[in-house]
């Protein structure tokens, strides 16, 4: 095992079977895992615990390494690294130590409400030493507010919940590489020494067999120049590398005689154009590789170099390079080039000589949240260090105190910048519980110091054998980020060096032991690993003579049982949590499984959740760890339960009250609602789920509904993946979800005076104001639709010269008569709903508002969205489709007992997509709904009884089943159970042994000629709702320059009639239609007003004029000093300026500003 502070030691959490009150699932699993899945949020929580050094983390470290072990947190490490900061003369120094946190200023809910950070003040002890007088001054210094992680692994930044994603990067270390020379077709070898921080050092052998070196990507020079610069004599070089002809020939031709010449030569190559001196050259070389301030391998880099070059742990604490490192690297390179397979290291250890695979997980490590924040704090502290040095030289030595030296702004700015703008600090995906959980377990190769999606090739994106058990081969986005963003596998954890480990069961002499070892990808390469389904007896002895195993580089082989070293702990070890929730995954094509895993994260929580008939056994654990359930840590009795809170009288006599979150808006606009699961007086145990969250049912992840599905075409209405639904689903709110939108408005100080929130809005009827209270804010419970006023607001207009009458009115009525504009907040186009919440912040109530803002109001509008044509539905196997038709219940096909089908899917959606899992799920779903009874005495069931677990012989109707991935129900078991399914209450078996039933056409009452596959499938309603996509415009805002309509629903834009559409019109010869589209329907500013007037007055449409964009084009050409003129038919130049006066008057008389641009539209929104 590796030594050092455990970064993310996985704590054994509750086993699913131990969770009190867990619903029973009948599982088809044949393999029992010796350990439970580790805590699914440990990746985030443990890394942050290491950073700030929580008491629990310190206790675990001491337990692991003994009481006397020195335990340092991430923050302590940086302060030790930085201290002492000395001035340029070395007379004074400042040391920082003992970081500690005070209590957090606001609760999580307060931080969300006030749009501030959930953070705790960080203090450090600063000690100033005056070396000349020996005087020591010590003070506690406030560094800034440090964002704290919530118990769900998230951060609250500016009131929104964010997640810091772990980054996959190339590990520091030494990497050997081989390329084939195009001209000679000989292999050429190179090596890179990559530090965590500092200059790269590269050696290579070129096609002329000379060994060269590049320092920090600069010009190449002979490697012997570097060795001589390090103080090696020609004799020493010959003694060490005399075995290599290419080194000797390089030595002869290097052109430098001694150390001084070599140093100057290196300086010339590194700093061309500067005058070299020996001291400058020496300090350049020292700073590049041998000074800890400038060069840092990090512990992981030192570990990788020692391991690759066989240098042992004799200088484990040294984070810079040594001469021995450089010499051994060169020796390894020349032996590799010579084709040798092994070499003896300076320690006498025999090590293999081979090139490295950069995509291997032994060479890629994780920067988890703690390390990412630590790096950012380091950046801030190094900026602060410069300020401290400057202040030491400028201030009087007698009066200096630590606080006068330290400027904490760079540190807090660096932290703020990271959380606010870094690519790895992301707006949390709160669409449902699963999407939040998988977001926290995401691994990204993008971000600062990582890859960019433009430069990443196929190799780095591809699935690698070393991903097994570490990163899921299925769950990754479609599109440009494919393969660059992954998900941590179910059982994986992160070791002290940031490498991902996965657990294996130890096998000794063909016998299983109780020992579980976590192996990195490098370590695993040395062992022979068997699959989790390897047969063994009760004693643990492997029963098969030969076993299928995995060798290095993913090769599969058959070996004798005594040759096996390890065995997988579980069949679902290789997949992530999201993928592990797809039943019959083993029967799905990988492309469709990828879509299935991703689409589960897009499912919207429904009003009434329902657990899937066919699960995988992962639903309980995923929901438990996601953090959206309410779990009681104490045992006791429920003393009070309501929709808003649950009070438990604990066994020790203390009362615990749990507040439930009701109808809160998530980041994605879905509804976050918790519902109690316990009753008054009920006994609860520690660890029991007492309230469900969004998308959970009885503590299980429940993202969709079980629907009775028939696979058949229906009049072509389910062509191309369209879906036919039963009207009953709409009426009974089976696929109905609640969506909450937040609308915000603020009243500011303007140049002309302060804006005012008021009910007194000019030119607005009382009917429009009926739902506003006396402050001008909409009442809670009001039903609103697009265009309705939510908050009344008036803004002062520019004052004009007042007439005597107006001055008189102003004198009598005071301010009321002044000019104001209506800038009220209205419901955006296309939105409706019910007002469920109002938040009012004002400067008078001492709320913290942005400068210039006097009041801020937030309105929450909830909308109940029933399923409708155009909404997207999906199963868990990548089988997605759009609702094409909602049929009346009486027209739907029905079973002989009168049960109508809920949903019809097209059979063509299955074969070429090869996601057969959906068909098997349908069969098992029917079985779970109907129940089954297997008679063990019946000879026809003999084979079935052999494989079926004993508790699955009798299963009642309406039961929940589990078919774990790669270890689920077999085809034979499904066929056997279908033959033994229970009849309905009339004694009839509806579905035959082949999983098909005779369906009757709801319209004619005639049975269909062929039997139809029917059963229950778990269907999800995805967040691609037609309400959010459908859009239409008659008039609206125009772009300020081209005067063409804006684009997109958010801008209330038009539909672009593009180049290809114009060609289509030209091809049809539709000249007048085309002219209209390009002028009066687009940017003929005068023409469109005249057309509007003609339509209103019922007159004929006038002829189009000149489009504005044509005028813009002319102006742009003229700006290039080209004299472009428009000529009439007789050749005389034409003036293109439109008659603006007429057009303004026409618009005014109609009471409409048709030419409004982006700005004025935004003001009136």
Curated annotation (Swiss-Prot):
Q: Which reaction does it catalyse?
A: RNA(n) + a ribonucleoside 5'-triphosphate = RNA(n+1) + diphosphate
Tell me, what's a Pfam family for it?
RNA_pol_Rpb2_3
Q: Does the keyword Transferase apply?
A: yes
Q: What is its EC number?
A: 2.7.7.6
**GO process terms (BP):** DNA-templated transcription
Keywords assigned by UniProt, alphabetized: DNA-directed RNA polymerase, Nucleotidyltransferase, Transcription, Transferase
Determine the domain of life of the protein's source. Bacteria
What InterPro entries does its record include? DNA-dir_RNA_pol_bsu_ext_1_sf (IPR042107), DNA-dir_RNA_pol_bsu_external_1 (IPR019462), DNA-dir_RNA_pol_su2 (IPR015712), DNA-dir_RNAP_su2_dom (IPR007120), DNA-dir_RNAP_su2_hyb_sf (IPR037033), RNA_pol_bsu_bac (IPR010243), RNA_pol_bsu_CS (IPR007121), RNA_pol_bsu_protrusion (IPR007644)
Recall the GO molecular function terms of this protein's record: DNA binding; DNA-directed RNA polymerase activity; ribonucleoside binding
Give an example GO cellular component term for this record. Answer: DNA-directed RNA polymerase complex
Q: How does it assemble?
A: The RNAP catalytic core consists of 2 alpha, 1 beta, 1 beta' and 1 omega subunit. When a sigma factor is associated with the core the holoenzyme is formed, which can initiate transcription.
* The protein's role, per its UniProt record: DNA-dependent RNA polymerase catalyzes the transcription of DNA into RNA using the four ribonucleoside triphosphates as substrates.
Family affiliation: Belongs to the RNA polymerase beta chain family.
The record's section on PANTHER family has: DNA-DIRECTED RNA POLYMERASE I SUBUNIT 2
Could you tell me what this protein is called?
DNA-directed RNA polymerase subunit beta
Q: Which source organism? A: Corynebacterium glutamicum (strain ATCC 13032 / DSM 20300 / JCM 1318 / BCRC 11384 / CCUG 27702 / LMG 3730 / NBRC 12168 / NCIMB 10025 / NRRL B-2784 / 534)
């Amino acid at each position: 095992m590796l030594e050092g502070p455990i970064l993310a030691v996985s704590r054994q959490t509750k086993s699913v079977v131990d969770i009190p009150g867990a619903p029973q699932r009948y599982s088809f699993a044949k393999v029992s895992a010796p350990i439970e899945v580790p805590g699914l949020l440990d990746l985030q929580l443990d890394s942050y615990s290491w950073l700030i050094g929580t008491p629990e983390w310190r206790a675990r470290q001491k337990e692991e390494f003994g009481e006397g072990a020195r335990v340092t947190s991430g923050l302590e490490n940086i302060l030790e690294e930085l201290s002492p900061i000395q001035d340029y003369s070395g007379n004074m120094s400042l040391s920082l130590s003992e970081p500690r946190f005070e209590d957090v200023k606001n609760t999580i809910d307060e931080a969300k409400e006030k749009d501030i950070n959930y953070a705790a003040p960080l203090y450090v002890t600063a000690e100033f030493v005056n070396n000349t007088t020996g005087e020591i001054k010590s003070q506690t210094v406030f560094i800034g507010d440090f964002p704290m992680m919530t118990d769900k692994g998230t951060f609250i930044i500016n009131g929104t919940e964010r997640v810091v994603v772990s980054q996959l990067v190339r590990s520091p270390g030494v990497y050997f590489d081989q390329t084939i020379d195009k001209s000679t077709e000989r292999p050429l070898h190179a090596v890179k020494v990559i530090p965590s921080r500092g200059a790269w050092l590269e050696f290579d052998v070129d096609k002329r067999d000379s060994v060269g070196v590049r320092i920090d990507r600069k010009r190449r020079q002979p490697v012997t120049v570097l060795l001589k610069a390090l103080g090696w004599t020609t004799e020493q070089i010959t003694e060490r590398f005399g075995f290599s002809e290419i080194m000797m020939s390089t030595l002869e031709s290097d052109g430098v005689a001694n150390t001084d010449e070599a140093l100057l030569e290196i300086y010339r190559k590194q700093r061309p154009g500067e005058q070299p001196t020996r001291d400058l050259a020496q300090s350049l070389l020292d700073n590049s590789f041998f000074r800890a301030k400038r060069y840092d391998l990090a512990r992981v880099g030192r570990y990788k170099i020692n391991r690759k070059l066989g240098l042992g742990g004799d200088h484990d604490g040294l984070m810079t390079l040594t001469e021995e490192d450089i010499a051994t690297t060169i020796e390894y390179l020349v032996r590799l080039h010579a084709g040798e397979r092994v070499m003896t290291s300076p320690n006498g250890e025999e090590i293999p000589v081979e090139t490295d695979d950069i995509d291997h997980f032994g060479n890629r490590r994780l920067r988890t949240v703690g390390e990412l924040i630590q790096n950012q704090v380091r950046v801030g502290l190094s900026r602060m260090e410069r300020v401290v040095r400057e202040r030491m030289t400028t201030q009087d030595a007698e009066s200096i105190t630590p606080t006068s030296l330290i400027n904490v702004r760079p540190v807090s700015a660096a932290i703020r910048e990271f959380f606010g703008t870094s690519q790895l600090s992301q707006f949390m995906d709160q669409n449902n519980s699963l999407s939040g959980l998988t977001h926290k377990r995401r691994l990204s190769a993008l971000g600062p110091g990582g890859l960019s999606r433009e430069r990443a090739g196929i190799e780095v994106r591809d699935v690698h054998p070393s991903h097994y058990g570490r990163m899921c081969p299925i769950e990754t986005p479609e599109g440009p980020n494919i393969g660059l963003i992954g998900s941590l596998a179910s059982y994986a954890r992160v070791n002290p060096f940031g490498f991902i480990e996965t657990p294996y069961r130890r096998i000794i002499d063909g016998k299983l032991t109780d020992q579980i070892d976590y192996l990195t990808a490098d370590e695993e390469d040395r062992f022979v690993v068997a699959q989790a389904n390897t047969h063994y007896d009760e004693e643990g002895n492997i029963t098969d003579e030969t076993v299928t195993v995995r060798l290095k580089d993913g090769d599969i082989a058959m070996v004798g049982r005594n040759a096996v070293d390890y065995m997988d702990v579980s069949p679902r070890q290789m997949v992530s949590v999201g993928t592990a929730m797809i039943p019959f995954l083993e029967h799905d094509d990988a492309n469709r499984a990828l879509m299935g895993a991703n689409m589960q994260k897009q499912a919207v929580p429904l009003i009434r959740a329902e657990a899937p008939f066919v699960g995988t056994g992962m639903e309980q654990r995923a929901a438990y760890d996601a953090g959206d359930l309410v779990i009681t840590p104490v045992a006791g009795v429920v003393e009070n339960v309501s929709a808003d809170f649950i009070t438990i009288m604990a066994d020790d006599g203390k009362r615990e009250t749990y507040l439930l979150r009701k109808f809160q808006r998530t980041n994605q606009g879905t509804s976050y609602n918790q519902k109690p699961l316990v009753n008054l007086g009920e006994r609860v145990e520690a660890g029991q789920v007492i309230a469900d969250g969004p998308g959970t049912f009885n503590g299980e992840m429940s993202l969709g509904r079980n629907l009775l599905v028939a696979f058949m075409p229906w009049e072509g209405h389910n062509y191309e993946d369209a879906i036919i639904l039963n009207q009953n689903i709409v009426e009974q709110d089976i696929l109905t979800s609640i969506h909450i939108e937040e609308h915000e408005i603020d009243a500011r100080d303007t140049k002309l005076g302060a804006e005012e929130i008021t009910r007194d809005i000019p030119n607005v009827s009382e009917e429009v104001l009926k739902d506003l209270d006396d402050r001008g804010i909409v009442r809670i419970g009001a039903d609103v639709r697009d265009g309705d006023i939510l908050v009344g607001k008036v803004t002062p207009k520019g004052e004009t010269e007042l007439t005597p009458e107006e001055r008189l009115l102003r004198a009598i009525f005071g301010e009321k008569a002044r000019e104001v504009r209506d800038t009220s907040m209205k419901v955006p186009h296309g939105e409706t709903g019910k007002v469920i919440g109002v938040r009012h912040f004002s400067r008078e109530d001492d709320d913290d508002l942005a400068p210039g803002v006097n009041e801020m109001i937030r309105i929450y509008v909830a909308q109940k969205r029933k399923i409708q044509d155009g909404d997207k539905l999906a199963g868990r196997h990548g089988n997605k489709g759009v609702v094409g038709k909602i049929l009346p219940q009486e027209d739907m096909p029905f079973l002989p007992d009168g049960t109508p089908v809920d949903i019809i899917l097209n059979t063509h959606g299955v074969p070429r997509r090869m996601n057969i899992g959906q068909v098997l799920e349908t069969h098992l779903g029917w079985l779970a709904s109907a129940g089954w009874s297997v008679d063990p005495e019946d000879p026809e069931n003999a084979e079935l009884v052999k494989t079926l677990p004993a508790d699955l012989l009798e299963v009642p109707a309406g039961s929940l089943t589990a078919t774990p991935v790669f270890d689920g129900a077999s085809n034979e078991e499904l066929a056997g159970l279908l033959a033994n399914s229970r009849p309905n209450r009339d004694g009839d078996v509806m579905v035959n042994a082949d999983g098909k039933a005779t369906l009757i056409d709801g319209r004619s009452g005639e049975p269909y000629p062929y039997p139809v596959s029917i059963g229950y499938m778990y269907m999800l309603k995805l967040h691609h709702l037609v309400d959010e996509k459908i859009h239409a415009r008659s008039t609206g805002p125009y772009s300020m320059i081209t005067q063409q309509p804006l684009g997109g629903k958010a801008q209330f834009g038009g539909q672009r009639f593009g180049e290809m559409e114009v060609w289509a019109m030209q091809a049809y010869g539709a000249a007048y239609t085309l002219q209209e589209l390009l002028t009066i329907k687009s940017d003929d500013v005068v023409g469109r007003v005249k057309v509007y007037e003609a339509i209103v007055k019922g007159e004929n449409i006038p002829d189009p004029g000149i489009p504005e964009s044509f005028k813009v084009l002319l102006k742009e050409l003229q700006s290039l000093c080209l004299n472009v003129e428009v000529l009439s038919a007789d050749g005389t130049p034409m003036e293109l300026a439109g008659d603006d006066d007429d057009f303004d008057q026409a618009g005014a008389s109609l009471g409409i500003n048709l030419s409004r641009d982006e700005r004025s539209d935004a003001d009136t929104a």
